[in-house]
Amino acid sequence: MKTSLFKSLYFQVLTAIAIGILLGHFYPEIGEQMKPLGDGFVKLIKMIIAPVIFCTVVTGIAGMESMKAVGRTGAVALLYFEIVSTIALIIGLIIVNVVQPGAGMNVDPATLDAKAVEVYADQAKDQGIVAFIMDVIPASVIGAFASGNILQVLLFAVLFGFALHRLGSKGQLIFNVIESFSQVIFGIINMIMRLAPIGAFGAMAFTIGKYGVGTLVQLGQLIICFYITCILFVVLVLGSIAKATGFSIFKFIRYIREELLIVLGTSSSESALPRMLDKMEKLGCRKSVVGLVIPTGYSFNLDGTSIYLTMAAVFIAQATNSQMDIVHQITLLIVLLLSSKGAAGVTGSGFIVLAATLSAVGHLPVAGLALILGIDRFMSEARALTNLVGNGVATIVVAKWVKELDHKKLDDVLNNRAPDGKTHELSS
């Protein structure tokens, strides 16, 4: 039985976003006061992310016949992440050089309000390769869950899954308990998602109310350029990858449309993580693959953020007339290949990584961040949406490469020919 239009989450979130935009535009002061609604919803989602990742990864790994398959999946995923995120960085670099949205602005860095970006610059000082690696190791298991650090929880879950697998039949009771706990957690997710329209309304009303449409007009060329680049990346790059894998990118986008709308409202791809874990498994990807690829992708496969970082850095150089010859741009690309891996899928993280990149490159003024501070919030929607689609496609591709993809189920679900829960024999 089909859900009526008015009862569908897709329609409710879309309506809430539209109402939020109108409220923020016509009554900006009231719109700004709606911020707790958006923040509250995102906090509810973050509350559940750690246990979802733990349960999904542990049951996925412990339930596998061979531990070699887990290592192979991880290696394939990291290889894919590096290739695709590099393509995203290069595309951003090419487009911003061709369009040159910052050319002619002739901004003197000395006149910019450096205090406005001090908080991001300070946070960026902690962004280093060694610091990033050390941060993956939690000081305590409880601390990892309490802080909601995705990579720390993932590391513990992988180790726990390996250990549980080695116990064999002795660990069956623990496995069953975690699997039952997982069902409870996903039940909680279903309850939280009913609040998605309220969260999307609050976040959008606040954004428009605080920053206004005037900010959009002022630096509109960069925003439009970035959005078009993200669309082209999804359609051409991810679309080509999807076609080579045996599915349509447009049908996949339709399949995750509710998650995309939630991300559009909250500007954080992290807000859709729990549902993506569930939906990718229902699409025919083995649980162990989903549990490894999706959480890891939130730090290593942020395609939208990669495009944003190159475009924003070169835009600042163009606007402040800073020298950016081919050597400087190659240096920028190399730095971003490393620094972009530290961006989690949460609102504002891309801006912090950008600050770290400008500091590392040296010849670009960090104060130039003030130029895009006002519009960063509007660009985060495109970043988050591209990140979400990119991680979904990555999961299917990796699942196919390691022969853990149910092709029949994938085809049936995307073409609405079978219920999500129906299973088919795995094909190689």
UniProtKB/Swiss-Prot annotation:
Gene3D superfamilies: Sodium:dicarboxylate symporter
Assigned keywords, A-Z: Cell inner membrane, Cell membrane, Membrane, Symport, Transmembrane, Transmembrane helix, Transport
Gene Ontology biological process terms, A to Z: L-aspartate transmembrane transport
Gene that this sequence comes from: dctA
Compartment(s) where it occurs, according to its Swiss-Prot or TrEMBL record: Cell inner membrane
Chief location bin: membrane
Keyword Cell membrane among record annotations: yes
Domain of life: Bacteria
Name under which the protein is recorded: C4-dicarboxylate transport protein
